[in-house]
A protein has these predicted regions:
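P-loop NTPase catalytic phosphate-binding loop
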Residues: 220
Length: 399
């Protein structure tokens, strides 16, 4: 095993020891809303319950600064962030001030923890790629395995969480796959796209990619209908006809909303600026989580209606309520941005700035925040600031 993986394990062991010695047994898990986030939450929930912790979960689409502030104003608590949080480790440290034990199990871009009570358990810090070699669920799985070897029976969730990473399973994800195969939780099969993995412990054997899609639908489209909780239940107890019917209903709901949005854009076109093309969905996706606008933008970026050299931006209204948490103090809109293929190549050649640089900056200018990758990013801005945001992004995109 590579030394960087061993270094990462050693740091995890310290966090596990701290958790075991902590006097409090109530834990709040804050997790992301996609399949990786649901799998991560399910792993740590089950692992902690086996150690007699009481566990609550909150599913977040974005980690709002005001949520960090409210949670970490408390004292003597245990907070575990899964598949979310690393980008905000510095902010979490500032607000936590060693008052609570905080573990961040994530694989996204990170800021560094400045608080010894905030453990930023991210493979990226140790030179392991979170984009290619380690999903959030894999990070969480190895944490659970160090906590108790019994948790190796959760290795299949690491594989489902890894489905979002393109290409063959590699790196730390492959180490988890070895465990899953050894335990008979996963079966290898061939598909026309190459190697496939069938998950054999959730009822009927299904491809890990199909289960990943189903969980993401529950977490995003079903965000306001108890979808994330239902998704965690699927992760641990398997599929049944009732949940499959519910997933089918959500997929149809999204398909109708996507179709309606596409027809409107084909009829009216996108609003064109010098470097940005954009649309506002308003309440087209009402009742669904905001991840749906990102999925729609990804699809739209491949359509002929899109200018291949301009950043593509979609905006939708957001509900101020977060299930299991309460209401945000401000009204925001969700921003999703994608780059068409040609623009993506230009960014790769450093002829155009990456979204990961310009989108957060434009969001911050308009009362919000953002994060993401070079060709796909998202954020929020204050409601009413949409036009100013796209104008700011347009200027930044021309630099």
């Amino acid at each position: 095993m590579e030394s960087k993986i061993l270094d990462f394990y050693e740091y995890m062991k310290k966090a596990v020891e701290k958790l075991k010695s902590y006097r409090i047994k109530e834990t709040l898990i804050i997790h992301h809303d996609d399949a990786d986030g649901l799998c991560s939450s399910a792993i740590v929930k089950k692992a902690l319950e086996r150690e007699n912790f009481t566990v609550k979960t909150i599913c977040l689409e974005k980690l709002f600064p005001e949520i960090i502030e409210k949670l970490h104003s408390d004292e003597g608590k245990i907070f575990i962030y899964t598949d979310i949080g690393s980008a905000h480790a510095e902010k979490i440290s500032e607000k936590n001030k060693s008052k609570n034990l905080t573990l961040i199990l994530d694989h996204h871009d990170f800021t560094r923890s400045k608080d010894p009570m905030v453990y930023n358990l991210n493979p990226e810090i140790f030179g392991i790629s979170g984009e290619k070699e380690a999903s959030g669920a894999t990070v969480t799985y190895f944490f659970a395995k160090i906590l108790n070897k019994q948790n190796m029976d959760l290795a299949y969730l690491s594989i489902i969480g890894s489905a979002e990473i393109p290409g063959p399973i590699s790196g730390l994800n492959k180490e988890a796959l070895k465990d899953a195969l050894e335990k008979g939780l996963v079966e290898t099969s061939k598909s026309r796209f190459g190697e496939d993995y069938k998950i054999s412990v959730l009822g009927k054997p299904l491809s890990y990619k199909r289960i990943s899609t189903m969980l993401s639908v529950l977490g995003s489209v079903g965000y306001y209908e108890g979808g994330p909780e239902k998704g965690i239940k699927v992760c641990l107890e398997g599929l049944n006809p009732t949940i499959e019917k519910f997933i089918g209903k959500l997929e149809e709901k999204r398909r109708i909303a996507n179709q309606k949005m596409l027809e409107k854009i084909r009829k009216e076109g996108l609003i064109q600026l010098k470097n940005v093309q954009w649309f506002h969905a308003y309440d087209n996706f009402s009742g669904m989580g905001t991840k749906v606008i990102g999925s729609f933008c990804s699809y739209l970026s491949f359509q002929k209606i899109v200018n291949p050299k301009k950043y593509l931006v979609g905006i939708m209204n957001m509900q101020p309520t977060i299930p299991g948490y309460g209401s945000l103090t401000k009204n925001y809109v969700k921003i999703s941005a994608r780059t068409p293929k040609l623009l993506g190549q230009m960014i790769g050649e450093e002829k155009k700035p990456p979204l990961s640089k310009i989108l957060p900056e434009a969001c911050e200018k308009n009362g919000g925040f953002g994060d993401g990758h070079s060709v796909a990013a998202s954020g929020v801005v204050l409601k009413g600031k949409e036009k100013k945001f796209v104008e700011d992004l347009d200027v930044l995109g021309g630099k």
